[in-house]
Amino acid sequence: LDANQHAAFERFIRRGGGFVGVHSASDTEYDWPWYGALVGAYFKSHPRIQPATLRVVDGTHPSTVHLPVEWKRVDEWYNFRDDPAAHGRALLVIDEKTYSGGTMKTHHPMAWCQEYDGGRAWYTALGHTIETYGESLFLEHLLGGIRWAAGIAAD
């Protein structure tokens, strides 16, 4: 994005707009600190695609209310430069004991949300593989995040 597009996006959020970030949304715009703060964390690295266990830490959020407490699935598991929950609300964490290549130790958020600069931001690190978009639990997770970011109450 150029400077005008940055300004327009910032204006949108400051006027109460919502942002939804999926997977690689944390792996872009490294020279735009406002965007990094909106997303909540920047990508650091990832191991190979493999199975792992996710744990819901906030089962009241529209993006997690339908999920099992423990959710086993296959994806590309991102490590982040900083703890995304430092400024936001962790919704889903990954158990680093269930796969190889995690670098964040005991608290490794994979989905989170926050009120930011007048608007709302929701992010999920899930969604690398095409198969993910055929999984009903993932699609409900994504829809819940979209609805929350848009300020739409759940049905």
Task: Go through the PLM ranges and name each one.
Residues 10, 36, 64, 143-147:
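Non-transmembrane alpha-helical segments in soluble domains
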Residues 1-29, 118:
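Short alpha-beta junction capping motif
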Residues 98-107, 115-155:
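Extracellular ligand-binding/catalytic regions of CAZymes and related secreted enzymes
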Residues 14, 18, 40, 147-151:
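Sec-exported extracytoplasmic/periplasmic mature domains
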Residues 27-38:
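Glycine-rich, charge-decorated loop segments at or immediately adjacent to ligand/cofactor-binding or catalytic sites
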Residues 23, 46, 128:
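Histidine-centered active-site/metal-ligand motif
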Residues 13, 18-22, 89-92, 113, ...:
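Structural recognition of the beta-strand scaffold that forms the well-ordered cores
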Residues 41-118:
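Catalytic beta-strand/loop cores that center a nucleophilic Ser/Cys/Thr
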